[in-house]
Amino acid sequence: MWKILPAAGIDPARDRTGSTWAEFIRSQATAVIAVDFACVDTALLARFHVLFVIEAATRRVHPAGITTNPTGAWTTQAARNLLMRLPEEHGFRFLVRDGAGQFTAAFDTVLTAAGITAIRATARSPQANAFAERWVRTLRHELLDRTIIWNERQLRALLAEYVDHYNRHRPHRSREQRAPDDVDTTTPTRPIERIQRRTTCGGLNNEYWPAA
C-alpha cells in the first residue's frame, strides 16, 4: 500500500492528518474494485463460497463463481473468466483483496496482465475492504437471512435474481438514492402521481417505478 499511494499522488506519511486510505479510495473510486467471498450454508449442511467483485464508484456487483472448494486454482480461473466478461476499456486499475490463501500469486498475475494492481488489505481491518464487507452484510440482511437455501441450483437462481435487483433497482445513499446501473442524474420535472411495484426473490424485495 505504501508504494501504491505515492503513485496515486497521495502522501502516505504516518503523521499526516486524516485517513490516507480513505483519500485514496475517494480520489481513485472509478478505478477501484474489490473482491471477496460470501459464505452460504444450506439446510443440508453444505457450505458454498460465492466469489464476487464490487465497483467502488458505482457499487455495481459482478458475481464471479460459486463453489464448495475455493482453491487458489479455482479462484484464479474465476478471475480470468470475469475479466473476459468485462468491457475491454473497463478503466479499473486497482483491486482490493484480503490475505486469504485463495488469492495466490497466480491470481495477482492474471490481474497484472489486465492492467490491474492487486492491493492486499491490512489484516484484521475489515474497513480496508469496506465495499466488499458491506455487500456481504447487505446480501445476508436482504436475502440469505430471510430464506432457506437447499442446494446450489436454488442458490444460483436466487443470487442471480438478487444481483439483478441490486444493480438495477436498489437505491444507495452514496449515489443520491440511485441504483448502481442508474446513470440518470436528472430529477423529475413533475410530481409522480402513481407508483408501480414488483416483488423479487420470492417476495423478499420490492422494486418501484413511476407508472406510465
Could you tell me what each predicted segment is?
Residues 1-212:
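Charged DNA-binding/catalytic regions of mobile-element recombinases
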